[in-house]
């Protein structure tokens, strides 16, 4: 099988995870699951970035040791991913011993290339962004200096640090972007990066001496690595680096896809490839920067009190329901909005009505009238052949959308087919055909149910990456064995006469809790 290595960004565990984190994990998980079902050998890496001043300050404010806070909060992130059915192969933490070794080896390679030097740094630093800013990138607002880009407070910093010769990589980066147009996506982010790099790059401060929570610089333990050198290296660690002769590294590096938020595109599309070029390591194939998820159009924040807890949401509405909503509602790559009303509408309209009701009605008729066995169809009429052709052509379309990180379009294509299937079912009127004594009508009855069950089966196969548990239940109801669930099974028709289990509902309608009477 062809290897496929996909990663999420690693989150800062300085606070509790929110639905924005879940959005990235669910999207990346859907891609990983899709590739597995499409016969790829997938490695899926996620985790937490436990280093940096942000985590150290959060621990100091909480009055606990930094390592303890990082470990405790990382556990929360890992439990959230498990609760959302994220199928990662490794949950990395930047405090892991092998990650320290990987970070040090990357540093040594960049140093050996002559790209690291010691100098004094003075400038503005944002703890929240873990990033330096020059004067022109800041502004005074009510007596507080903030970054223009993110609106976060900055403090003046002066210390001796190591620098990376980022300025030497301007032309090499631009050449790579132009030679590899799919390296950065979507196009708006690619254009942003090219514009930024075209303006010329300054050398980058890559160590700190003002705190000690991080990976120590080789042979200079009074310095810790700038958090982004350490953090970005996690992608190499997850592939077995620094053992470049290992089977893991030779099989999975370079990464096929880094999935990140749009706010960290500069680190991934400018700094990271420059570090790798310096170290003589092949660059990842693609970086996709998704948009933000807002609450009713408003940015989520603790101060506003509108942060959505993804685990509580999944417990109330269902894990697969939340996964479907997040990937169906928002054009992936753009900013999107969450609301209670929108997710309930998707659950009741798309899942309960369009898919769940179609599966339930057709399978119930099979159970009641055909001894609970897959019907033996007659000759396909034009309407049957047209619907089957639409369903058969879905895999290629859906694959193209997933390869472009357009999961919303993949789901839209599947639901357009389900819309056609519901219209077909209504026009064919199997409930009327069932009552007829005509042999031709009975053949149409069996054929209609066969075609409906077959397109429901194909839909269930294709929604497995997004809704693995629910899709699995539908495939169970259709008598599909575990070895009949990869995408290779799309073209293998249901076998007439297959015994089916008693039908049960898969997607119940959501009814909001009613207040007690008299309230």
UniProtKB/Swiss-Prot annotation:
GO CC terms in record: cytoplasm; plasma membrane
EC number: 6.1.1.10
Class in the EC hierarchy, top level: ligase
Transmembrane segments: none
Assigned keywords, A-Z: Aminoacyl-tRNA synthetase, ATP-binding, Cytoplasm, Ligase, Nucleotide-binding, Protein biosynthesis
Compartments, record wording: Cytoplasm
Domain of life: Bacteria
Motif ('KMSKS' region): 299-303
Pfam families: Anticodon_3, tRNA-synt_1g
GO BP terms: methionyl-tRNA aminoacylation
Reactions mediated catalytically: tRNA(Met) + L-methionine + ATP = L-methionyl-tRNA(Met) + AMP + diphosphate
Motif 'HIGH' region, residue range(s) on this chain: 11-21
Sites where the protein binds ATP: 302
Family membership: Belongs to the class-I aminoacyl-tRNA synthetase family. MetG type 2B subfamily.
Subunit structure, as described in the record: Monomer.
PANTHER family: METHIONINE--TRNA LIGASE, MITOCHONDRIAL, METHIONYL-TRNA SYNTHETASE
Protein name: Methionine--tRNA ligase
Organism: Mycobacterium tuberculosis (strain ATCC 25618 / H37Rv)
Gene name in the database record: metG
């Amino acid at each position: 099988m062809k290897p496929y290595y996909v990663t999420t960004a690693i989150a800062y565990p300085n606070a509790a995870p929110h639905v924005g984190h879940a959005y990235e994990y669910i999207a990346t998980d859907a891609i990983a699951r899709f590739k597995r079902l499409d016969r790829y050998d997938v490695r899926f890496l996620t985790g937490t970035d436990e280093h940096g001043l942000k985590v150290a300050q959060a621990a100091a404010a909480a009055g606990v040791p930094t390592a303890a806070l990082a470990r405790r909060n990382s556990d929360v992130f890992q439990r959230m991913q498990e609760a959302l059915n994220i199928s990662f192969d490794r949950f990395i933490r930047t405090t892991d011993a092998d990650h320290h070794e990987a970070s040090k080896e990357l540093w040594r390679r960049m140093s050996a290339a002559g790209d690291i030097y010691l100098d004094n740094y003075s400038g503005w630093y944002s703890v929240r962004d873990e990033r330096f800013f020059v004067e022109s990138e800041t502004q005074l607002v009510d007596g507080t200096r903030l970054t223009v880009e993110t609106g976060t407070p900055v403090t003046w910093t002066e210390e001796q640090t190591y620098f990376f010769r980022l300025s030497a990589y301007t032309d090499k980066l631009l050449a790579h972007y132009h030679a590899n147009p799919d390296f950065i996506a979507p196009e708006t982010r690619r254009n942003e990066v090219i514009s930024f790099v075209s303006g010329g790059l300054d050398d980058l401060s890559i160590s700190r001496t003002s705190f000690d929570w991080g990976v120590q610089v080789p042979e200079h333990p009074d310095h810790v690595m700038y958090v982004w050198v350490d953090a970005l290296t996690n992608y190499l660690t997850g592939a077995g680096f620094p053992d470049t002769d290992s089977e893991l590294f030779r099989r999975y590096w370079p990464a096929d896809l880094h999935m990140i938020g749009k706010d960290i595109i500069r680190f991934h599309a400018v700094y990271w490839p420059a570090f790798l070029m310096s170290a003589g390591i092949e660059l990842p194939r693609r970086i996709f920067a998704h948009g933000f998820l807002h609450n009713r159009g408003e940015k989520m924040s603790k101060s506003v009190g509108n942060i959505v807890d993804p685990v509580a949401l999944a417990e109330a509405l269902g894990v697969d329901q939340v996964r479907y909503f997040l990937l169906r509602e928002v054009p992936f790559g753009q900013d999107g909005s969450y609301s209670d009303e929108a997710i309930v509408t998707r659950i009741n309209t798309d899942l309960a009505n369009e898919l769940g009701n179609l599966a339930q009605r057709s399978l119930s008729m099979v159970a009641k009238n055909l001894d609970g066995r897959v019907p033996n169809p007659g000759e396909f009429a034009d309407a049957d052949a047209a619907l089957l052709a639409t369903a058969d052509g879905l895999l290629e379309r859906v694959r193209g959308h997933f390869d472009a990180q357009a999961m919303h379009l993949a789901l839209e294509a599947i639901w357009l087919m389900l819309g056609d299937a519901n219209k077909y079912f209504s026009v064919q009127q199997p409930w009327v055909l069932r009552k007829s004594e005509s042999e031709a009508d009975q053949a149409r009855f069996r054929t209609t149910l066969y075609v409906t069950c077959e397109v429901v089966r194909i839909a269930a196969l294709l929604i497995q990456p997004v809704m693995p548990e629910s899709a699995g239940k539908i495939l169970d109801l259709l008598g599909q064995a575990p070895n009949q669930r990869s995408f290779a099974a799309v073209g293998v028709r249901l076998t007439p006469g297959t015994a089916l289990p008693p039908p049960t509902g898969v997607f119940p309608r959501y009814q909001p809790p009613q207040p007690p009477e008299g309230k």
